[in-house]
Amino acid sequence: MAAVTRYSGKVVVVTGGSRGIGAAIVRAFVDSGAQVVFCDKDEAGGRALEQELSGTVFIPGDVTQERDLQTLVSETLSRFGHLDCVVNNAGYHPPAQLPEETSAQGFRQLLEVNLLGTYTLIKLALPHLRKSRGNIINISSLVGAIGQSQALTYVATKGAVTAMTKALALDESRHGVRVNCISPGNIWTPLWEELAASTSDPRATILEGTLAQPLGRMGQPAEVAAAAVFLASEATFCTGLELLVTGGAELGYGRKASKSSLGEVPTLPPNVH
């Protein structure tokens, strides 16, 4: 019974809620007693989840369109009268690209989804979150802190999400609004599966992603969702926090250089033969 009531009576908005981590977050908040309003460009997926889960409202929307986000907030307030938590989950990871293969146009488009959509919804929701002394949870990424090869633009957007979280936490503390972010590592989602399928050897890509964690597996969307419910409910003394849900992928030393970057012979320290 405690799990059902831990966020009872609260109203939560989730972006990108139709599948993967977003759908798991919607489900977890409903299981915790909240009313959840979620948006996604995938209308069919959103309608299906809305039909499956009582306590949810789906509103089709694109986070790059401010009008859609205005509708998301206004519909939430019209139906429920208040807003307690915003989860900025919508985001995209492009296929692997070398730096010279990226473009300014592609970077701008990614910024619109991964960063500016988050910023815009925060601005629209803040007056209402201040009234409820609510909280914001931004979904960032481990690679925003540690980097990732062939993901220059994605890493930049997620690093910015984490930095924005910390800056906003300082500004909003005086209003009693907590602002935190979750940085997942390798989580087995439809997007991860699609990215693997775009490589020359999907099975090898999946194996590499699996072995990146000391725990020896990828995470599940429900594990990220559990972290989100914790931040919204029990974590009342946490703000500006980046919560890593990574299976320990960032831990330890490991091989970083490739033969192409070393040349034929590695450069060893003096007196090493």
Swiss-Prot record:
Keywords: Carbohydrate metabolism, Cytoplasm, Fucose metabolism, Lipid metabolism, NAD, Oxidoreductase, Steroid metabolism
Location in the cell: Cytoplasm
Alphabetized PROSITE patterns for the sequence: ADH_SHORT
GO molecular function: D-threo-aldose 1-dehydrogenase activity; identical protein binding
GO BP annotation list: L-fucose catabolic process
Catalytic activity: L-fucose + NAD(+) = L-fucono-1,5-lactone + NADH + H(+); D-arabinose + NAD(+) = D-arabinono-1,5-lactone + NADH + H(+); L-galactose + NAD(+) = L-galactono-1,5-lactone + NADH + H(+)
EC number(s) per entry: 1.1.1.122
Active site: 154 (proton acceptor)
Signal peptide interval: none
Broad EC category: oxidoreductase
PANTHER family, per database record: 17-BETA-HYDROXYSTEROID DEHYDROGENASE 14-RELATED, SHORT-CHAIN DEHYDROGENASE/REDUCTASE
Role, per record: Catalyzes the NAD(+)-dependent oxidation of L-fucose, yielding L-fucono-1,5-lactone, which rapidly converts spontaneously to L-fucone-1,4-lactone. Can also act on D-arabinose and L-galactose, with lower catalytic efficiency. Does not use NADPH. May be the initial enzyme of the putative L-fucose degradation pathway in mammals.
Self-association and partners: Homotetramer.
Protein name: L-fucose dehydrogenase
Organism: Mus musculus (Mouse)
